[in-house]
Every structure is written in C-alpha cells, then in structure tokens.
UniProtKB/Swiss-Prot annotation:
The porphobilinogen subunits are added to the dipyrromethane group. Belongs to the HMBS family. This is Porphobilinogen deaminase. Transmembrane segments: none annotated. Keywords: Porphyrin biosynthesis, Transferase. The modification S-(dipyrrolylmethanemethyl)cysteine is found at C242. The lineage of its organism: Bacteria, Pseudomonadati, Thermodesulfobacteriota, Desulfuromonadia, Desulfuromonadales.
Length: 315
C-alpha cells in the first residue's frame, strides 16, 4: 500500500472539522504509519448565510465543492454529514463507508432551560429547516418561527442576541462539540422526526480507488448504513431537498428495519405520516414504499404546491 498521505476534504466549520478529525484519528489508529491530512473547503452553503436554505435553491449546497475536489484529485476522501448529501451521487463517486450513527434526534436549546411544553404562547423559535418548522407548527401553531442560519456557535449566539425563546438543532452536533449541557430537551421523533441521515457521517471517495476503500472499510457500520440507505431511497423517490418539509428515520433491530416518514405543509397545517417495517434486505424497497404510501395519502398535492415533482420509479 502506498505510504503517501491520505487527504480528507471537509467543510471548515468547527463541527465539520471535528467530524473529519474523528475520521483522521480512527484511520491513524487503525493504520500505524499512515499520514492523514485535512483539507478545509468552503462550500456555497457556507458562503450564503443571509438567505434561508429553502430560498437558495439547488441540492448539494454543502458538498458540491468538496466533490469537485475529489474529481480533480486534490483530495482522496470526503467526510460529510449525511443529511447534507443529495440522494443521487455524481457519476464516479461512491459512499462506501458510513460509521456508527450519533444521536439522530433534534434538540431544543433555550436560554433558561425551558422544555418544549413550557414554551410561552407565541414563543420565538429559531431553525433553518422547513422540516422542523412544519412539525413544530403542526403541534404549536402559536409559535413564531425565526429563520436561523450559521454554524452551531453562531446559532447559539443569535439566540441570545436576538431574544429568541429557543432554537432547535441536531443533537449530534451539540454532543460532538461537547455542548450537550446546553440541551433543554431532546425532542422525541414523535415531536420532530429527524432529517434523512441525521446523526450519521458519510465517507465519499472515487469509484475504483482501492487504496482509500481498503483504508476506510473498518469504519463502516452495517446497521447504520442499512437505515440510511432506506431513508435516502425515501428522499430520492420524493425528490426531496431543503425546499421540502419531509423527514424520515429508520432503525434496525434483529434484522428488521422499521421506518417512519412524513411530508408536511410548510405552515404545519397538513402533516402526513406513516410507519413501515420489513427485513433489512428490503431497506431501499421500504423507503420507496413508504414514499408511495405518503404520495397516495396526499403528499403528492403538498409537493405539487411546492413545484416539486416526485422522481419516477425505475422499473
């Protein structure tokens, strides 16, 4: 095996660097003598911070520039948050390794430690995701949802500076940054179903790069990968992205995959939710079937109102 350094491309935020450094440490421990270097890359999503993601448009806002670095050979491996990765990869790139998942739940952070049930009438809640907005408003139509962009530290600061009653973030990011003590409440998946791939990392490389594939193989977690594959099949069928309030979460136990999915109106007025279970070997079929069930129950109308056309099923 070549002794040249393995170059990991990553976004430059503190959380993204933590994730890439975790992979770096794992690889250097697994392969003594291997040099792993990080290559921070600024993405379009990092540059545009004054516009809600749903209005920026497009997919891959936090990965495209990193994938371009894979294409041109300036990096060997990309470390992504799986929830940022579009459901269809560019030709020639693969996601062969998904490590064990961190906590997939959303978390409520409040200045005074209040729980969701204790939030006052008309509370101002910050979030960047239509998915969260729709689910929170479905339960609490009185809430005033404030668009909130930026990295974890920026969002925590804005909560204080802009006098918000709370913000909703991914629990995984707070835990990885050792900020779990800021969490007032872990929101159950019944209250806020997570984003596709939330809490999971994705390691992306060039197809046929045998050296990189061999190096990262020990980090792969089969159960996490099966769950994420099902979630991404759901996302792919519904042609989802930042502009669509949809969510899905799959779990694996005793070779059975159980998956919950939903599609909602942005204002939370209508929310369609279903659960399916099947053997893990049928993971992608479960994701597609769950999407079909929601479409038949009215999700097609919600998507049409957002000018989103579901991806046709491949025979």
């Amino acid at each position: 095996m070549s002794s040249s350094a393995l170059r990991i491309g990553t976004r430059a935020s503190r959380l993204a660097l933590w994730q890439a450094e975790w992979v770096q440490q794992q690889l250097e421990t697994l392969h003594p003598g291997l040099s792993v270097v990080l290559v921070p890359i600024t993405t379009k999503g990092d540059k545009i911070l004054d516009v809600p993601l749903a209005k920026v448009g497009g997919k891959g806002l936090f990965v495209k520039e990193i994938e371009e670095a894979l294409y041109d050979g300036s990096i060997d491996l990309a470390v992504h948050s799986m929830k940022d990765v579009p459901s269809v990869l560019p030709p020639g790139l693969i996601l062969p390794c998904i490590p064990p998942r961190e906590d997939p739940r959303d978390a409520l952070v409040t200045p005074d430690g209040r729980s969701f049930a204790q939030l006052p009438q008309g509370a101002r809640i910050g979030t960047s995701a239509l998915r969260r907005q729709a689910q929170l408003l479905h339960r609490r139509p009185d809430l005033d949802i404030v668009s909130l962009r930026g990295n974890v530290e920026t969002r925590l600061r804005k909560m204080e500076e802009e006098d918000m009653d709370g913000i909703v973030l991914a629990a995984a990011g707070l835990k990885r940054l050792e900020l779990a003590e800021r969490i007032a409440e872990y929101l159950s998946v019944d209250v806020s179903l997570p984003a596709i791939g939330q809490g999971a990392l994705g390691l992306e490389c060039r197809e046929g790069d045998d050296r990189t594939l061999e190096l990262i193989a020990p980090l792969h977690d089969a159960d996490t990968a099966v769950a994420v594959r099902a979630e991404r099949a759901f996302l792919r069928r519904l042609n989802g992205g930042c502009q669509v309030p949809l969510a899905a979460h799959a779990t694996v136990a005793e070779q059975t995959l159980t998956m919950v999915g939903l599609v909602a109106e942005v204002d939370g007025g209508s929310l369609i939710k279903e659960t399916l279970a099947a053997p893990v070997a049928q993971a992608e079929a479960v994701g597609c079937q769950l999407a079909e069930t929601l479409l038949a129950r009215g999700a097609d109308r919600i998507l049409a109102a957002l000018d989103i056309t579901p991806t046709p099923l491949v025979p």
